[in-house]
C-alpha cells in the first residue's frame, strides 16, 4: 500500500491544476517534475517560441503567507541554474527566449482552488 502525505497530495493536486491552467492558456507542456542532482523543475512548457520554466507553489491557506511569497530570490536563482541544466540535458531544444513563471495555487477547505499565474518573474 502506498501512503501519500497530505502535504504531498495537496502539492500534486496544485501541479495538476497549474498544468491545466498553462495548457488552457495555449502552452505545450514539455516536462513535469524534472529532476537532477541540483533540484527539480515543476513544469517546463513552450509558449510560442518561448521556453517557460514554471515553479508551482500550492498552499491550503494564506495564514503562513501566500504561495507567491514562498518564491524567494534564492528560489529564483536556483530555478535559473536548473533551467541551464535542463537545457544542457535537452540539446535539441534551442529556444530564442526563456521565461520563469510562477503558478500559485490556493486550495481552501471548501470551494474551488484559486490560481494566480505570474509570467516573467525575475
Swiss-Prot record:
A GO MF label: nucleic acid binding
CDD domains tied to this protein: PoNe_Nuclease (cd20736)
Domain of life: Bacteria
SUPFAM superfamilies: Restriction endonuclease-like
Family: Belongs to the UPF0102 family.
NCBIfam families on file: PRK12497.1-3, PRK12497.3-3
Protein name: UPF0102 protein Krad_1407
Species this protein is from: Kineococcus radiotolerans (strain ATCC BAA-149 / DSM 14245 / SRS30216)
Amino acid at each position: 500500500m502506498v501512503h501519500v502525505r497530505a502535504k504531498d497530495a495537496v502539492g500534486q493536486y496544485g501541479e495538476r491544476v497549474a498544468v491545466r491552467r498553462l495548457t488552457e492558456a495555449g502552452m505545450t507542456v514539455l516536462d513535469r517534475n524534472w529532476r537532477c542532482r541540483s533540484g527539480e523543475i515543476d513544469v517546463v512548457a513552450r509558449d510560442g517560441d518561448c521556453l517557460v520554466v514554471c515553479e508551482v507553489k500550492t498552499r491550503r491557506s494564506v495564514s503562513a503567507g501566500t504561495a507567491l511569497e514562498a518564491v524567494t530570490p534564492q528560489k529564483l536563482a536556483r530555478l535559473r541554474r536548473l533551467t541551464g541544466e535542463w537545457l544542457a540535458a535537452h540539446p535539441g531544444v534551442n529556444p530564442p527566449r526563456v521565461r520563469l513563471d510562477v503558478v500559485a495555487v490556493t486550495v481552501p477547505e471548501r470551494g474551488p482552488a484559486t490560481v494566480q499565474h505570474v509570467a516573467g518573474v525575475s
